[in-house]
């Protein structure tokens, strides 16, 4: 059974992480990647994630399963970056666990908004576009995840770090 779990939330611009030992958070943060294009950021990620790996002790990596992307080009860039990140984080005996976003979000009590909750947002902010309401619900769900992190004694402002904690 895994006792040292590294939760990660990766993107083409950063990796957020939370290291849990025996279900208790011990180290967390976010590393930003720099570069004028995805390939420069991949190289930066390779160096920074290698350094991060040297400072962390884990036996399992928990990564959010990619569900959908807006374009094929974005999906390819994410695949390149995730490959670079995972290649640096993995040891020979590292277990990898992929978790669907709705599964971990539900586990921490951050389920999708119900019709009633969505209607409450519309009632509170009348006259907005559907896109505005969708974005507002997304923001509120991000805040729920940040609030969950606070229940563990972690003060974070980055929803990326909060996602890694979740």
Give residue spans per PLM region.
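Phosphate- and other anionic-substrate recognition elements at nucleic-acid/protein interfaces
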Residues: 1-166
